[in-house]
Amino acid sequence: MGSLNTEDVLEHSSAFGATNPLDPEEFRRQGHMIIDFLADYYRDVEKYPVRSQVEPGYLRKRLPETAPYNPESIETILQDVTSEIIPGLTHWQSPNYYAYFPSSGSVAGFLGEMLSTGFNVVGFNWMSSPAATELEGIVMDWFGKMLNLPKSYLFSGTGGGVLQGTTCEAILCTLTAARDRKLNKIGREHIGRLVVYGSDQTHCALQKAAQIAGINPKNFRAVKTFKANSFGLAASTLREVILEDIEAGLIPLFVCPTVGTTSSTAVDPIGPICEVAKEYEMWVHIDAAYAGSACICPEFRHFIDGVEEADSFSLNAHKWFFTTLDCCCLWVKDPSSLVKALSTNPEYLRNKATESRQVVDYKDWQIALIRRFRSMKLWMVLRSYGVTNLRNFLRSHVRMAKTFEGLVGADRRFEITVPRTFAMVCFRLLPPTTVKVCGENGVHQNGNGVIAVLRNENEELVLANKLNQVYLRQVKATGSVYMTHAVVGGVYMIRFAVGSTLTEERHVIHAWEVLQEHADLILSKFDEANFSS
């Protein structure tokens, strides 16, 4: 069998890119260009439509069908980023972005990501990169102390923390640990009887995690919430559902209360839910993906009261903690449950440090083997801004949300649909002549002798929902602001989530002016027939 003669297969290449792919001087030159490019982008980000205006498939029509045979210059590539990629971006860092939840960025977060990516280490166990492992444990304890988590969640106590990519990963890992802990007691043949509980407001990540973990889809419970409890999960309702399941021969396994639901930022009562769960030996995981960060502020800490009774707690630092995607912080009281459920120990990974049991091997705290050096960017954020400034950044967003809430509340054409808890306001535009039926004929004569059609509550709801769908669509079409919607308790409402790092009060005022302008337009041309079909 002949050997390969590499000289025979080397091909001629143009000058661009002929240097080593990791040449330090070329890295310096191109790196400066990228930094300048991004700095200009953030300087000018307000000039772009917040939501991309392109049609599906736009990019395939504009880029070649095959990769370039010869290298191209960074200058050419950045020109294409400007002309082809940026038009297809929805600008999540725009100060006029109020959709979904924020994905807040910061200089420290970006630079921390640059360091992490630049080192490009694979820290699956302590031996593979000791600094990556140890820094992660340190920053998770720092952050846990900022949240005033009990020592049972910290490495300095009896627990510990790990950086996952997303909430879905955090829930899947803890659910897997809960599943195995339970099945080791009752026998693995009973997996089909295990039940997972959330509310009808719980993030879909819980249902996805349950599917992946092998929970019978029929045994996933989205417990109904009610307006009387601000759409939080009532412990009494949870108990009723659990008792019904036990009567049916099922086994309660896992419940996931939320601090700041996606639809309305509702807060489930952690303490009472933990009391119920404890009676039935259930694992309690607290999903504080959005609002958990706010709990570093003393005035918001009470929202996670009861965390000491739960088993695990997670939040997304990439949402509202200026740390850039992806960075989900997960704390657990019993790390051994995670390790037992998730560890593998092939011969090629064996080493003295692991066998000493004096180190953490984070590969056993997550789904994948490889892992990124996420702790670097969180460390950069914590050090660059400090607790005081981080609290004040969060408070500024809450203050701006309060300003917006006041503007909406002062305009009788609008309604605040659920109480504001953090930095998101949920509201809707009301249809004209919103009056309740007070007579059998369904009409009402006002003081000016004008006859107005009266509507029952269901008709009113249908009409208001359709009106707000059209209204939001028109507002988004302007490109100047971006908001999204939710349906809670049957009510279609508009979500205004303040959280972009660049947002200032003037941007909030501008958003309100856009909303008022389009409310004037849609109401001036209002024809009930157009919204009733």
UniProtKB/Swiss-Prot annotation:
<dbReference type="InterPro" id="IPR015424">
    <property type="entry name" value="PyrdxlP-dep_Trfase"/>
</dbReference>
<dbReference type="GO" id="GO:0030170">
    <property type="term" value="F:pyridoxal phosphate binding"/>
</dbReference>
<dbReference type="GO" id="GO:0036468">
    <property type="term" value="F:L-dopa decarboxylase activity"/>
</dbReference>
<dbReference type="GO" id="GO:0036467">
    <property type="term" value="F:5-hydroxy-L-tryptophan decarboxylase activity"/>
</dbReference>
<dbReference type="InterPro" id="IPR015422">
    <property type="entry name" value="PyrdxlP-dep_Trfase_small"/>
</dbReference>
<dbReference type="Pfam" id="PF00282">
    <property type="entry name" value="Pyridoxal_deC"/>
</dbReference>
<protein>
    <recommendedName>
        <fullName>Tyrosine/DOPA decarboxylase 3</fullName>
        <ecNumber>4.1.1.28</ecNumber>
        <ecNumber>4.1.1.25</ecNumber>
    </recommendedName>
</protein>
<dbReference type="GO" id="GO:0006520">
    <property type="term" value="P:amino acid metabolic process"/>
</dbReference>
<dbReference type="InterPro" id="IPR002129">
    <property type="entry name" value="PyrdxlP-dep_de-COase"/>
</dbReference>
<dbReference type="GO" id="GO:0004837">
    <property type="term" value="F:tyrosine decarboxylase activity"/>
</dbReference>
<dbReference type="InterPro" id="IPR021115">
    <property type="entry name" value="Pyridoxal-P_BS"/>
</dbReference>
<comment type="function">
    <text>Marginally higher substrate specificity for L-DOPA over L-tyrosine.</text>
</comment>
<keyword id="KW-0663">Pyridoxal phosphate</keyword>
<comment type="subunit">
    <text>Homodimer.</text>
</comment>
<keyword id="KW-0210">Decarboxylase</keyword>
<comment type="similarity">
    <text>Belongs to the group II decarboxylase family.</text>
</comment>
<dbReference type="GO" id="GO:0019752">
    <property type="term" value="P:carboxylic acid metabolic process"/>
</dbReference>
<dbReference type="InterPro" id="IPR010977">
    <property type="entry name" value="Aromatic_deC"/>
</dbReference>
<dbReference type="InterPro" id="IPR015421">
    <property type="entry name" value="PyrdxlP-dep_Trfase_major"/>
</dbReference>
<keyword id="KW-0456">Lyase</keyword>
<dbReference type="GO" id="GO:0005737">
    <property type="term" value="C:cytoplasm"/>
</dbReference>
<feature type="modified residue" description="N6-(pyridoxal phosphate)lysine">
    <location>
        <position position="319"/>
    </location>
</feature>
